[in-house]
């Protein structure tokens, strides 16, 4: 059986590892480096460069050098995050055939999956060169907050690269696997993962080979790229003040600024000051212009202070969801290149009240963890059980636009949940199942993931058909939704994908607005519930009145008709109390009608019993046919 490899497909850098005996080991690439820049370049002659060679020539070929592609994977071209990204990168982002965000290089369009596949191929080739045999299977890591479309797109990238992706594993979970492989003492750890493009935090409990994720949170559009852009903007603004030229409008100059910004950021983790020196960055009528600016660590920290602060909210939420206090955390693991920044380390220490553990390599630990998971799947690593979670609540839209959860956030996966629903109208032959992800009570306030129709429901009064909706989340965090009509056994299902990704603002809005707007949400939900109850009573009363109205007196009938009219008027408004009051009034007014209906049913039932008794012969176990004349 060929070796299963573990790959950390990162925004900025990627890394590949394997299990060497009982220890995970990073494999060097063709250039002898342990990590590979996630950069792909296309040259004029059609040649394709990947990794460091691609990164080296970016300044001279900015429009055809693709980087930070992970930020686009699984997202639609109309996604606000993609719109924001268009102004940040020198290459062109275009709308793909299915509405997804694609990129253009030398006149050809590429999907993010294809570009990611080029990087995965380089990882695969490095592993094959090291092992001396073909590699066909892999475990690939993704941010914990990646949605279903992004996870599916990552699997597709693996497929394009010639890899069967046996498992998609969350990056912080992978880091915890690598950290805790040789530790059996029961520990609660926090993994703080600030990478090139995404931020995740996960709370885990480790003990006796069991790695149980208690909660996860994060931001899918926050990472080193954003830190670089703050430096780029600062340098460009300073140059514009001094020379009157905006370097952001020149793609070649912008690429040089980006490279220098990344270099400055790294240098300032170990030095107090860095001199940015870019000769011949631009020119004006009087000749060439040079950029020379001193950047201090203090200035950098001031520029990115709010970005670092944005990582603390998810940490608070993750602890809250895990039901833990800061003091309950035994160890904080730092992951991702940005966690090397002293200010980031200080922020983590200030929040958790303990110095973070720095014994793991933040650039390699995720790939090492992926290799451990690969070893588990291969059977080389025994007695390791990984229990991960789904990051956001999943559910469907029900009557009145209410979001009905089926699987709550931070539920251990794989998992399967079912619930039975019914129709809203008489003789309804089809239902539309709309799937949402989020934390708000109303569906429209959450992120819609997809929809599908269940057709061929036999005609029946509303509320009679039984439609079973099942959510199935596999170990990769990919969702499948089934709907089944219990009467006909007709089924329909959808694998959730391709509705654009969940941006940082989307996720923050879902969780934070859920707290801030709890009262308003509750009021809206109460209104929908009151209207649903009112309409149900109205419907049943009108039907009963039409069928049994002749069984009550004129006064009672008039009272019921008045109640119906008043409830209809109340239902047109937004006053919850008025709707509830008029609903109760109609229930009271129609009590006589209910008694008359009950009496009529009792009468017919007794008549039927009497007929049956006439035909009974007093003998043991003898069946009597009512239609046969009595002897």
UniProtKB/Swiss-Prot annotation:
Concerning InterPro entries, the annotation shows: ATPase_NBD, Chaperone_DnaK, Heat_shock_70_CS, HSP70_C_sf, HSP70_peptide-bd_sf, Hsp_70_fam
The keyword Nucleotide-binding belongs to this UniProt entry's keyword annotation: yes
Q: Which UniProt keywords apply?
A: ATP-binding, Chaperone, Nucleotide-binding, Phosphoprotein, Stress response
Q: Say if the entry is tagged with keyword 4Fe-4S.
A: no
Extract the SUPFAM superfamilies matched here: Actin-like ATPase domain, Heat shock protein 70kD (HSP70), C-terminal subdomain, Heat shock protein 70kD (HSP70), peptide-binding domain
Instruction: Please give the record's induction comment.
Output: By heat shock.
Q: Mind telling me which PROSITE patterns this protein's record contains?
A: HSP70_1, HSP70_2, HSP70_3
Q: Which residues carry this modification: Phosphothreonine?
A: 198
Supply one GO molecular-function term: unfolded protein binding
Highest taxon above the source species: Bacteria
In the record, the note on similarity to other proteins reads: Belongs to the heat shock protein 70 family.
Q: What does this protein do?
A: Acts as a chaperone.
Q: What is this protein called?
A: Chaperone protein DnaK
> Which species is this UniProt entry from?
Caulobacter vibrioides (strain ATCC 19089 / CIP 103742 / CB 15)
């Amino acid at each position: 059986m060929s070796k299963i490899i573990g790959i950390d497909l990162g925004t900025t850098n990627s890394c590949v590892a394997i299990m060497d005996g009982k220890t995970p080991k990073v494999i060097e690439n063709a250039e002898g480096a342990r990590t590979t820049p996630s950069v792909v370049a296309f040259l004029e002659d059609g040649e394709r460069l990947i990794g460091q060679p691609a990164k080296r020539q970016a300044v001279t070929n900015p429009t055809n050098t693709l980087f930070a592609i992970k930020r686009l994977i699984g997202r639609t071209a109309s996604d606000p995050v993609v719109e924001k990204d268009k102004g940040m990168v020198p290459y062109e982002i275009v709308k793909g055939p299915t509405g997804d965000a694609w990129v253009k290089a030398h006149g050809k369009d590429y999907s993010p999956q294809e570009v990611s596949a080029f990087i995965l191929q380089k990882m695969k080739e490095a592993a094959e060169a090291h092992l001396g045999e073909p590699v066909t299977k892999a475990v690939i890591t993704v941010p914990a907050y990646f949605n279903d479309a992004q996870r599916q797109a990552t699997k597709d990238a693996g497929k394009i690269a010639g890899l069967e992706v046996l498992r998609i594993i969350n990056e912080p979970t992978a880091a915890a696997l690598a950290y805790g492989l040789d530790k059996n003492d029961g520990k609660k750890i926090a993994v703080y993962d600030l990478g090139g493009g995404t931020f995740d935090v996960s709370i885990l409990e480790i003990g006796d080979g069991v790695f149980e994720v208690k909660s996860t949170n994060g931001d899918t559009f926050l990472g080193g790229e954003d830190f670089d852009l703050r430096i780029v903007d600062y340098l460009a603004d300073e140059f514009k003040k001094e020379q009157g030229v905006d370097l952001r409008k020149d793609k070649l100059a912008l690429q040089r600024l980006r490279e220098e910004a990344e270099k400055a950021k790294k240098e300032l983790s170990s030095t107090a000051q860095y001199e940015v020196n870019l000769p011949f960055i631009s020119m004006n009528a009087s000749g060439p212009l040079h950029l020379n600016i001193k950047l201090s660590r203090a200035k950098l920290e001031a520029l990115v202070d709010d970005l670092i602060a944005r990582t603390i909210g998810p940490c608070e939420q993750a602890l809250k969801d895990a039901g833990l206090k800061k003091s309950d955390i035994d160890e904080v693991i730092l992951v991702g290149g940005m966690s090397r920044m002293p200010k980031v380390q200080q922020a983590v220490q200030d929040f958790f009240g303990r110095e973070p553990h720095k014994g793991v390599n933040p650039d390699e630990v995720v790939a090492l963890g992926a290799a451990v998971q690969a070893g588990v799947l291969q059977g080389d690593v025994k007695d390791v059980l990984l229990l991960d979670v789904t990051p956001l609540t999943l559910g469907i839209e029900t009557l009145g636009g209410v979001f009905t959860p089926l699987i709550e956030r931070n539920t251990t996966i794989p998992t399967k949940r079912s619930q039975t629903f019914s129709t809203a109208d008489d003789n309804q032959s089809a239902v539309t199942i709309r799937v949402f992800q989020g934390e708000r009570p109303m569906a429209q306030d959450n992120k819609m993931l997809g929809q599908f129709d269940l057709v061929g429901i036999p005609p029946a009064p509303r509320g009679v058909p039984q439609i079973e909706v099942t959510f199935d989340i596999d170990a990769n965090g990919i969702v499948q939704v089934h709907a089944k009509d219990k009467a006909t056994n007709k089924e329909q299902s959808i694998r959730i994908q391709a509705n654009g990704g969940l941006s940082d603002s989307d996720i923050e809005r879902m969780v934070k607005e859920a707290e801030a707007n709890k009262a308003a949400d509750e009021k809206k939900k109460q209104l929908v519930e009151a209207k649903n109850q009112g309409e149900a009573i109205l419907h049943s009363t009108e039907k009963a009145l039409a069928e049994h109205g002749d069984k009550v007196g004129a006064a009672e009938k008039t009272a019921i008709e008045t109640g119906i009219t008043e409830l209809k008027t109340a239902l047109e408004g937004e006053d919850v109390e008025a709707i509830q009051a008029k609903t109760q009034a109609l229930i009271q007014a129609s009590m006589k009608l209910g008694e008359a209906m009950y009496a009529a049913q009792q009468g017919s039932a007794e008549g039927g019993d009497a007929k049956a008794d006439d035909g009974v012969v007093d003998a043991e176990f003898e069946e009597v046919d009512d239609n046969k004349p009595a002897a």
